[in-house]
Amino acid sequence: SQVDAVLQIFKVGGGGLAGNDDNGSPDSYLSFKVPEDGKYAVCVSDHLGRGGKHFVYRVEVAVADAEIGTTVNELERYVSQVVNVPKGSRMAIETNMVRKNVGGEARIQIPDLPEKTNHSDGLVAPDLGTIQMIFRADADAPNQSKLVDLRATLAVNPERTLVGHLNQRTQLVRGQNNVDVWGRFDNRLAVAVVEAAPFDIEIVQPQVPIVRNGSLVLAINAKRNPGFDKPINVRLLTAPPGIGYSPVTIPGDQSTIQMNLTAAGNAPFRTWPILVLATTDIGNGPITIASEFVQLEVADSVFEFKFSKTMAEQGKPVDVVVGVELKKPMEGTIEVEILGLPPGTASPTPKLVLAADAKQLAFPVTIPADARAGNYKTVVCRGTVTNDKGVITQVNGNAEVQIDVPVAPPPAAAVAAAAPMPPPPPEAPKEKPLTRLEQLRKEKGKQ
């Protein structure tokens, strides 16, 4: 129909550059960045390319102005976010810094908080759009609630500073597949001071980084009030990019727990502030508090692994040779452990010390006669650097082990009585373990 308009931008003498088919709104709209000086054409047409006397359109063109604002991520999906801060403790939220047609460092501030409460620094780096903010309440803060603004500022230049405010969408009616059918935008966030929690939570500051393809153990301590012995569920408010984890639960009779973090091979190098949320049931409902920030450093991998194919036969031992060296000098005990060996096989020394100048390690592996023949690509190596600061862990793989059925020997021919055996020759020095590529080169040289 004539109301189904398609808006397109063309460069005169060139091709199309942008377009919009009124997706999700009554009218076509697009934000277009002009690539260079020149002449451009705006084309409005019916979706089916038709025309007529009722096909009349008005086009508005304006220079896009810079805008900023803030939103808040929901801790629980489809539940409007509020902030309940227990007395003498903390609560935290994820806040988004919305920038339109502008970039740069910004700051989020929350004026007019309830009495005797404050929040963490709201500095937002130029390359970040989301930060975590902690709300703190003094132990003697009165029970009070307020609707507050999350005010954003960004200095475009010394003469101009942009100011933005909270614009939070609240869904009131959800349709099929949780589609937002009806709701409203609010410019205030509800913050309240509530009764104190029966515990506190803290993260022990890691002294070593987490490296790419590595893992790190976070130590988390709960400080329980006398008589409080309920389980405490612990999760990160948000994990940095490329970092994975699973929530943990502190049993009622314990006060410490470990949370394992893992880093992907492309995790960005950066030092990130992280915190945990701890939730428990106090009888009349759940209560959640936040820890203070600790700094998590994401660094480059420590080990350089090179894996080659290992050929083995049932009933014969074999050395799995792994190329491994340190990318940079490290202090402490450096070890490499082989994991994921084929079923039924084992290594008498699965963990070896890596010398600073080593280029490879050979792991002896016993292959029983009844080991299942086949190709196994499950072998990985875990490298660790242990010193007085902690343990740096990195896991890489996969190495390939091929187990074959041995070839049956030819039948023995009849021989005359053998002469006395000469004394055995002196034992030759043990050869350096060969990689699969070196084995093939050696066999080719014998031909």
List each language-model region with its residue ranges:
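C-terminal edge strands of extracellular/lumenal beta-sandwich accessory domains
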Residues: 2-16, 30-96, 101-102, 151-173, ...
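Short, solvent-exposed loop/linker segments at beta-strand-coil boundaries, enriched for Pro/Gly
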Residues: 7, 110-120, 236-246, 338-349
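Short proline/glycine- and polar residue-rich coil/turn motifs
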Residues: 22-25, 33-36, 113, 122-131, ...
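Short, hydrophobic beta-strand segments
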Residues: 31-34, 132-139, 258-265, 363-371
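Short solvent-exposed strand-capping/beta-turn motif centered on an Asx-Ser/Thr pair
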Residues: 47-50, 86-88, 96-102, 211-213, ...
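Short glycine/proline/serine/threonine-rich loop/turn segments at secondary-structure transition edges
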Residues: 51-54, 139-149, 159, 265-274, ...
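Short beta-strand segments of immunoglobulin-like
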Residues: 79-85, 204-210, 248, 306-313, ...
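Short edge beta-strand/loop segments characteristic of extracellular beta-sandwich folds
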Residues: 92-98, 136, 217-223, 262, ...
